[in-house]
């Protein structure tokens, strides 16, 4: 890879799509690539896909590029425009290295490049950050145009993004978002998995997952705090602490890769199965898993020693998760906790691999024999569930981690329903843990990125956050003392847990009061020069208000509205005019295309008084919107939390539900 001077790098960003075009680049086999996508387009649609791709280029290049893009479509199922992939190193540079007329635009450039950093992204050359299909852009022409627009943007313009495509810069004003992102917005009738395959191949939409297409991914750290909370509280359900408990799960990808680290922090022994050797090796080299084994007998010889010693240790099983579960069921192994975080939101395109088929053979099968691949996946899910059922009958606590495991298992005909076939036999982790303990009280995955790139700025921010949480905990009500204690323990140990992959970022579960006070202290520290550069605030879309998803984020909503998407849409609209630097709204994310509506924001803190005003207004809405909806659904914790919020802020007036006695309804129908 060519070494660029700072001036050369900045000129490349300003350039946009080069003319003349760069030479084609060879396919790099050392990088983890996306699997070949399904060949779903008709011949006429393939011509349309080429026509759509060529509109980024002058006519003089059309004949040459038409053949090149046709070959990409044939070989990979998508047009990535590999020729335009930059040859400079892709990572989050210090904010001052980005050529921008507007500080906010420079911060967004940093966040985009972090999402595409090979150390961070799952399939960096295909612009996929995580989840198998969570895209930042559809192709490299879009990336180059976005960087050009951001380098030109003033603080009175807004960049409009249509599913990776930059529609353009439009006049706005200083308090407007600098970027507004939509990903995968479809007419509801056209939101099935094959619709994603077709319209993504045509180059007209994309699946942004959550933080991939919204430029807010911070590596596997992004969910490790939530996963730690989940594992801790799942273990608490069994009693007796976490030491010596065995947790088995699957997935070492961009999000799922947080599981072994979370297990270590929670104090359990964990085994995480992963079929992709490149993903396993990546997490091992990054220190996110302690040992890797491909032989099950050898694996459990080591695991049993860790259990006996009651040491926190993480193991990766390099192989198929079904083989792992069936081994445990057949050998009578005691498993305390079980889950799954394979990408079952994307089951037919690399999110889940069938047992009995090698990884490489499965990739060929999914592209060339998609119906057979689907049959094999569903057969594997039936075996997967059967083994899990045997272990839960012996006392294991199993929970769905919001990856569509229960949903796809039910579609596969697995024995996943309860006795009267009215609900799944296993809870979503949101139903049992995250919803009632965190979301209903306003706690969720708040995050920040120090744009200086300096670890010392991150250290300072950790210290500020710990101080603020300590102050809040001193007078917090009993209902949230456990959450406050867990979060203080988290931030106290954050540095020593070596969580940073990519940008200097931190994840921290916090409620409205915590987020607002931490952000205000950050802004003050930037103003005083105690933190040397702006901080980007954000959160996962998987949060109190950000996502409507009946199989995950809103699975503990029982008033019938768990399939309604008003909350997520209202949230992004409200954030946009209350001061967010950028906002996004996506179809899909977590459980899958057509199953979820989710959104997020980014906010650049620059030390100004205007920023202090915006952060207080926006964060208050961003949390209390979701608490209000959860309260209206009669969730006890949310009713408590929103009443408390109204006491703190007299301007907040929320409609409260009147509870109905069961006797009133008896005998009516």
Predicted features and spans:
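Small-residue-enriched alpha-helical segments and adjacent helix-cap loops
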Residues: 535, 539-570
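Residue-level detector of anion-binding/catalytic polar loops
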Residues: 269, 334, 397
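Long, compositionally biased, glycine/small-hydrophobic-enriched stretches that function as flexible linkers
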Residues: 1-201, 205-216, 370-521, 525-538, ...
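Solvent-exposed alpha-helices and their adjacent loops that cap or buttress functional pockets
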Residues: 152-154, 170-174, 189-190, 238-242, ...
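Active-site/ligand-binding-proximal alpha/beta "capping" segment
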Residues: 314-342, 349
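Short catalytic-loop micro-motif centered on adjacent basic/acidic residues
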Residues: 246-249, 312-317, 399
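Glycine-rich beta-alpha junction loops
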Residues: 277, 319-322, 341-346, 402-408, ...
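Catalytic or ion-translocation cores adjacent to nucleophile or general acid/base/metal-coordination motifs
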Residues: 208-232, 236, 242-246, 250-310, ...
């Amino acid at each position: 890879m060519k070494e660029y001077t700072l001036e050369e790098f900045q000129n490349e960003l300003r350039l946009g799509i080069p003319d003349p075009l760069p030479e084609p680049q060879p396919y790099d086999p050392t990088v983890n690539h996306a699997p070949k996508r399904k060949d779903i387009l008709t011949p006429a649609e393939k011509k349309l896909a080429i026509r759509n791709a060529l509109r980024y280029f002058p006519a003089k290049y059309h004949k040459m590029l038409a053949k090149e893009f046709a070959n990409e479509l044939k070989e990979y199922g998508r047009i990535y425009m590999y020729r335009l992939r930059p040859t400079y190193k892709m990572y989050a540079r210090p904010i001052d290295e980005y050529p921008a007329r507007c500080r906010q635009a420079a911060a967004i450039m940093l966040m985009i490049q972090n999402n595409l950093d090979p150390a961070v992204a799952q399939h960096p050359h295909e612009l996929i950050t995580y989840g198998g299909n969570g895209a930042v852009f559809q192709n490299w022409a879009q990336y180059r145009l976005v960087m050009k627009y951001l380098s030109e943007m003033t603080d009175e313009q807004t960049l409009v993004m249509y599913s990776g495509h930059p529609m353009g810069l439009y006049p706005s004003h200083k308090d407007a978002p600098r970027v507004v992102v939509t990903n995968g917005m479809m007419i509801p009738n056209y939101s099935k998995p094959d619709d994603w395959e077709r319209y993504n191949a045509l180059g007209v939409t994309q699946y942004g997952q959550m933080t991939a297409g919204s430029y807010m991914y911070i590596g596997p750290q992004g969910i490790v705090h939530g996963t730690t909370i989940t594992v801790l509280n799942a273990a608490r359900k069994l009693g007796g602490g976490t030491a010596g408990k065995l947790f088995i799960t699957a997935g070492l990808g961009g999000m799922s890769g947080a599981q072994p680290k979370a297990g270590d922090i929670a104090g359990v022994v964990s085994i995480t199965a992963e079929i992709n050797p490149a993903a396993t090796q990546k997490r091992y080299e990054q220190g996110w898993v302690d040992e890797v084994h491909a032989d099950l007998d050898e694996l459990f010889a080591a695991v049993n020693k860790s259990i006996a010693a009651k040491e926190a240790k993480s193991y990766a099983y390099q192989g198929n998760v079904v083989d792992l579960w069936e081994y445990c069921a057949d050998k009578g192994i005691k498993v305390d906790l079980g889950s799954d975080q394979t990408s079952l939101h994307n089951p037919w395109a690399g999110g889940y691999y069938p047992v009995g088929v090698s990884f490489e053979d499965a990739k060929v099968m999914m592209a060339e024999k998609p119906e057979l691949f689907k049959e094999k996946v569903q057969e594997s899910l039936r075996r997967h569930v059967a083994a899990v059922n045997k272990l839960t009958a012996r006392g294991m606590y199993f929970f769905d981690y919001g990856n569509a495991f229960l949903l796809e298992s039910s579609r596969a005909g697995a024995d996943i329903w309860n006795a009267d076939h009215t609900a799944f036999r296993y809870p979503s982790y949101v139903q049992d843990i995250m919803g009632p303990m965190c979301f209903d009280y306003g706690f969720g995955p708040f995050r920040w990125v120090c744009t200086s790139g300096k670890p010392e700025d991150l250290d300072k921010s950790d210290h500020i956050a710990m101080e603020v949480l300590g102050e809040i905990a001193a007078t917090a009500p009993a209902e949230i003392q456990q959450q406050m204690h867990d979060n203080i323990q988290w931030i106290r140990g954050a540095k020593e847990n070596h969580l940073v992959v990519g940008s200097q970022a931190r994840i921290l579960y916090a409620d409205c009061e915590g987020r607002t006070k931490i952000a205000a202290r950050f802004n003050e520290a930037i103003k005083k020069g105690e933190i040397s550069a702006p901080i980007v605030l954000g959160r996962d879309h998987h949060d109190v208000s950000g996502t409507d998803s009946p199989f995950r984020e809103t699975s503990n909503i029982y008033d019938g509205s768990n399939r309604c998407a008003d909350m997520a849409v209202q949230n992004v609209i409200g954030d946009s005019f209350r001061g967010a630097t950028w906002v996004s709204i996506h179809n899909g994310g977590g459980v899958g295309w057509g199953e979820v509506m989710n959104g997020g924001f980014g906010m650049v803190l620059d030390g100004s008084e205007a920023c202090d005003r915006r952060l207080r207004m926006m964060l208050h809405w961003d949390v209390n919107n979701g608490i209000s909806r959860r309260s209206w659904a009669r969730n006890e914790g949310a009713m408590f939390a929103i009443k408390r919020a109204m006491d703190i802020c007299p301007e907040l007036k929320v409609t409260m539900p009147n509870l109905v006695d069961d006797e009133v309804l008896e005998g009516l129908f």
